[in-house]
Swiss-Prot record:
Protein name listed in UniProt: Large ribosomal subunit protein bL28
Entry keywords, A to Z: Ribonucleoprotein, Ribosomal protein
Lineage per the UniProt record: Bacteria, Pseudomonadati, Pseudomonadota, Alphaproteobacteria, Magnetococcales
GO molecular function: structural constituent of ribosome
SUPFAM superfamilies documented for this protein: L28p-like
InterPro entries: Ribosomal_bL28, Ribosomal_bL28/bL31-like_sf, Ribosomal_bL28_bact-type, Ribosomal_bL28_sf
GO BP term, pick one: translation
Cellular compartments per GO CC: ribonucleoprotein complex; ribosome
Length: 95
């Protein structure tokens, strides 16, 4: 699975692995990325997202995908998620 996310803002972090003898070797810490289908109540369909587990908890705390996408800034979203957020805003405005 690619370590790219559509929600959550997580990216691999680099640093040093330090042994007992203090020898340092470079390594990467990968985020816990999952592919999920989250239900959008406003759109009436599921949206497939690649999301970090911490962002998945944030979506749950916000009360669902719709509220989460409307709450965060569009600059923090990928183009595909911006499109979904725009569709949600348009549907809510029409209703």
């Amino acid at each position: 699975m690619a370590r790219k996310r559509t929600l959550g803002g997580k990216a691999p972090q680099a640093g040093n692995k330090v042994s007992h003898s203090q020898r340092k070797t470079r390594r990467q810490w990968m985020p816990n990325i999952q592919t999920k289908a989250l239900w959008s109540i406003t759109l009436g369909q599921s949206v497939k997202v690649t999301i970090s587990t911490s962002a998945l908890r944030s979506v749950d705390n916000a009360g669902g995908l719709d509220n989460y996408l409307l709450k965060i800034l569009p600059s923090e979203l990928t183009p595909s998620m911006r499109r979904v957020a725009r569709q949600i805003r348009e549907r809510k405005a029409a209703a």
